[in-house]
Amino acid sequence: MELLSTPHSIEINNITCDSFRISWAMEDSDLERVTHYFIDLNKKENKNSNKFKHRDVPTKLVAKAVPLPMTVRGHWFLSPRTEYSVAVQTAVKQSDGEYLVSGWSETVEFCTGDYAKEHLAQLQEKAEQIAGRMLRFSVFYRNHHKEYFQHARTHCGNMLQPYLKDNSGSHGSPTSGMLHGVFFSCNTEFNTGQPPQDSPYGRWRFQIPAQRLFNPSTNLYFADFYCMYTAYHYAILVLAPKGSLGDRFCRDRLPLLDIACNKFLTCSVEDGELVFRHAQDLILEIIYTEPVDLSLGTLGEISGHQLMSLSTADAKKDPSCKTCNISVGR
C-alpha cells in the first residue's frame, strides 16, 4: 500500500480550559484513505517523552478520522492554564488490524485557558450548597506583620496598595496572577459575632467599617471555591467599585452577584441603615480592587495566635474533593 504523507502546518485555536480545536494539512490523496488520527499530547515539561509506536497499545489519543478541524476535549487529561505540546500522525487501519501510519508531524505548543463564566457558575452553585446561614458583621479586617503597615504609612501615602493575587485556589481561576487587589476577611466567631482573635497572616490587624468597602456603589463577584485537603472550604469574592479597573476586569470573567441577595456576602438596607451578612460555613476571602486608606479604619494587635497552618498563600486546591470540584480541567 502507498505510504501516507506526513501531516504538517498544525493549527490550534478555540482553546478553553479543557478543550482545543486542531487542524493540519495532508496530501489530497490521503484524505479518502485515512481512517484514524493519533494525537500525542504532553504537558510541556514532558514534551520529550517517547511517542507511542503504532504496534503498541496506544497510550496517547486515538480518534477516528473526521473532517478537520476537530475538537479535542477532556478534563481527565487537560488542565487549565497549562502548557502542552502536540503532534499528530495519520493512519489507515488495514484488514489484518494493523495500521499503516504516516510520520509524526512537527510539534506545536499551546497553553490552555482559564475557567469561563459557565464553569465559575458551576463552582458558585456548589459553594451555595454548603454556605450555611447568614451572620451579621460590621467590619472587614486584614492581618499582617507590623512592618507591612509601617511601610504603607511611610512609603505608600498611608494607603494599602493592591497587589497581584497569588495562585491559591482553583488552577483555572481567571483571577490568579491577573487581578490586583487588597485581601480582606470578614468571618466572625459564632459565639461573639466579632472577628476571631487568631490569624495565620500576622498579629497586627487593620479593621475598616464594612460600608467603606461594600455599598450600593460596589459590584460583588464570585471568583472561586476550593479547599486544601481539610474540612474547611473557602470562597473567593471580589469587591470592585463600579466602573473601576477591577470592575472592568471582573465584568467579562466572573459571575456578578446581587449584593442584597446571595448566599455569601450581602449588603442590604434595613430600617434605613446598611446591614451586612456573611455565610457561616465558608471562609470568605475578599479581594478589594482599589487602594485602601489606613485613616478610614483602626490598627491594633490581636491577642490570639498566628496559626500558620491555616494560611492560604499559594495554597493548592484538593483535586479529589467532590464538594468543590467540577467536571472540567482542575
From Swiss-Prot:
Any one biological process term the GO annotation gives: protein localization
Signal peptide start and end residues: none
Entry keyword set: Glycoprotein
GO MF annotations, alphabetized: protein tyrosine kinase binding
CDD domains named in the record: FN3
Gene Ontology CC annotations of this record: cytoplasm
UniProt-listed InterPro entries: FN3_dom (IPR003961), FN3_sf (IPR036116), Ig-like_fold (IPR013783), PHYHIP/PHYHIPL (IPR042868), PHYIP/PHIPL_C (IPR045545)
Tissue: Highly expressed in the brain.
Family the entry assigns: Belongs to the PHYHIP family.
Role summary: Its interaction with PHYH suggests a role in the development of the central system.
Name of the featured protein: Phytanoyl-CoA hydroxylase-interacting protein
Gene behind this protein: PHYHIP
